[in-house]
Amino acid sequence: MNYVGQLAGQVLVTVKELYKGINQATLSGCIDVVVVRQQDGSYQCSPFHVRFGKLGVLRSKEKVIDIEINGSAVDLHMKLGDNGEAFFVEETEEEYEKLPAYLATSPIPTEDQFFKHIETPLVKSSGNERPAQSSDVSHTLESEAVFTQSSVKKKKRRRKKCKQDNRKEEQAASPVAEDVGDVGVSSDDEKRAQAARGSSNASLKEEDYKEPSLFHSGDNYPLSDGDWSPLETTYPQAVCPKSDSELEVKPSESLLRSEPHMEWTWGGFPESTKVTKRERYDYHPRTATITPSENTHFRVIPSEDSLIREVEKDATVEDTTCTIVKPKPRALCKQLSDAASTELPESPLEAPQISSLLDADPVPSPSAEAPSEPKPAAKDSPTKKKGVHKRSQHQGPDDIYLDDLKALEPEVAALYFPKSDTDPGSRQWPESDTFSGSQSPQSVGSAAADSGTECLSDSAMDLPDVTLSLCGGLSENGEISKEKFMEHIITYHEFAENPGLIDNPNLVIRIYNRYYNWALAAPMILSLQVFQKSLPKATVESWVKDKMPKKSGRWWFWRKKESMIKQLPETKEGKSEVPPANDLPSNAEEPTSARPAENDTSSDEGSQELEESIKVDPITVETLSHCGTASYKKSLRLSSDQIAKLKLHDGPNDVVFSITTQYQGTCRCAGTIYLWNWNDKVIISDIDGTITKSDALGQILPQLGKDWTHQGIARLYHSINENGYKFLYCSARAIGMADMTRGYLHWVNDKGTILPRGPLMLSPSSLFSAFHREVIEKKPEKFKIECLNDIKNLFAPSRQPFYAAFGNRPNDVYAYTQVGVPDCRIFTVNPKGELIQERTKGNKSSYHRLSELVEHVFPLLSKEQNSAFPCPEFSSFCYWRDPIPDLDLDDLA
């Protein structure tokens, strides 16, 4: 009995350790890579499938993956996605190339970019500056300290605050006040503002609420991987609303990130398979109250129910609608302190008024768009403590209409356009020069797009804001003023009564503050509406030269550039100067060419004022123009030039992918890169049921120390490899079992003979989905056909690299046939060890007997020849051998 007890205990311990190793939350793995040297000296490679487990919450710098090949670090890095997948980042070839949301990403931060913001000196300030500028300095100081451990702890404390009772929140000191500089608000007001924000945040369930990152980069990539870009600021990033008048909060999709619901195909990226199309159509979005951020600049008009819940401090979520309405222009407060102390009107709108806003005409009513003037509230007012939406302390003094920003002073305007405010949710017109120095051309959704979840809105599919006017003036040398344009603006009723206005020679179409005639604007709008694609930039430029009336050359500057330039620091003499390119905020690193072609003819608002107000140094302009509107996309493959820099040698090359985190140390994934030639011959071998005796037990028993390998297979494979053939091991196991499977192949030993080394091709999908597909569904051929076809395409198109294949099921035979393996060299083995050739199924053999015929079935590959038998059916063994002599049966009798 003691024997049995010890054996059972050993088995339990082994199984427990095995489970720890295959836990899907901690699985990390790397699929081997095949690089094929072509006849012309170029290279092609299979995808780099690398996955790290349990690394979901990392900072931007901790998402950079280092690569070592043959023990030496290489100048090549990968980036970590939301689901632990690694990918390369490459710049798009075309400036306005349209990318799917799941492919767009941000560039990999480098060491210089990571520490550049910390080493940037503070901007010199003049003695007569306003006291409110101290808040800007505090913002800078906090942004320089974003990498400290204290800031991480403060962020955790803020998360815990949302879970506490709201009464305690009113009495507790706000930890956020330590992170963000005061903007002329008293401490009592700040506490009440924090309490109001806490009650609003508490109305969302914990799993439905995703706190916006406090530190976001000025180089804003809306389709990033849920990470932060190199340069950090203290402003949260805006999300992409569904529309300008309504914001709907979708239910939590956190489960989509969990392992069993992610589908990862060969050569692709992880995609969610939990939400079906039917579920999407049947889904009714829930709405919740929100707190306005500095990126929206809209007034929030909540429903009556949400206000009652805030008064009662109830943290439950109900089906209420939160409507955002653009305010009308109003007078700006003269003093910054007065403006900072203002707040929203206390009287909420009734529910019928809110519902009418949703069904209103495109021309809003005055009652909906003209909120009452904000009044300075007394510090001890008891009504301020209840039911009032306080402004976020990240925001400026008050909401303001965008057209009124021209009258602001630079330090006041900076409060409305912080350094990170690149407006990722705004629509972008393709031929325009984007605002952010390295922003992706598509401004859609959120960081969750990389994990396969849906974006709230794809603004690249929306039409731009188009305004019609009969002001004329495109054929004149003078500029089109905004007053003149608005004076002759065409309303909907006028256009409905007389659509022939498009033939009027004075018709001017304004598209994002640029003016065009109908001949040019029509194809641009039509292309976006019909094909959901923008016209190429080259086409638009040539179209402008042909269709627009000629004018004198001038600079193309956008209105956002004007507000950006006004934010540039002033010297003591009061003159604007442009700092060096490396010290510019990300908003100042313009992606556009500062001086266009001389025949640029489209008009732009406010350009004359810019030319008069600032003189840009030519060297700086040239530096900015070379920044380019570069957008970046994910990739799993390297180019031929990148592969050449790796300095691979023929055969296996050990590669290690490592990522270092502050709390988890260094995590490594080891694999192998195999360099083959274009004329190599490859033998395909399955693992489960082919090398092992069965599919299911072959994955479990070897981990318990039990040898479950077919006898004679190691010697057969070794003999075939000595004749010059390459081996490729293809299994439908999951990528998380790569190390386990690779270790098993090295562990197989048949009286001193081991299996030859070869690339291990596994499924990049999850552990349980791969196990279910291979063992339960018994359909591993789906993955194998995709994988083997991809490997086949790496070789010359006219060549067949696969010489023979070994499997154990009809599914394997079907997959091998689909990739071009001759059926005369497809072998299957059953659990008894009987080897069957597909062409002659009645003839059963074994691995031992086939080893005796290796020289005939797998002849030695000559170095001078590309293959042993170009036509194997006419080989000396099958055709060119001496015929059997005729025998006289009478003599034998």
From Swiss-Prot:
This is Phosphatidate phosphatase LPIN2. Residues 122-216, 357-400, 417-456, 568-611 are annotated as: Disordered. It holds the Pfam family Lipin_mid. Residues 1-108 are annotated as: N-LIP. InterPro entries: HAD-like_sf, LIPIN, Lipin_mid, Lipin_N, LNS2, LNS2/PITP. It catalyses: a 1,2-diacyl-sn-glycero-3-phosphate + H2O = a 1,2-diacyl-sn-glycerol + phosphate. Residues 204-213 have a biased composition (Basic and acidic residues). Coiled coil: none annotated. Its cofactor is Mg(2+). GO terms for molecular function: phosphatidate phosphatase activity; transcription coactivator activity. Residues 601-611 have a biased composition (Acidic residues). Residues 123-151, 423-445 have a biased composition (Polar residues). GO terms for cellular component: cytosol; endoplasmic reticulum membrane; nucleus. The keyword Phosphoprotein applies. The modification Phosphoserine is found at residues 106, 174, 186-187, 243, 303, 563. Its EC number is 3.1.3.4.
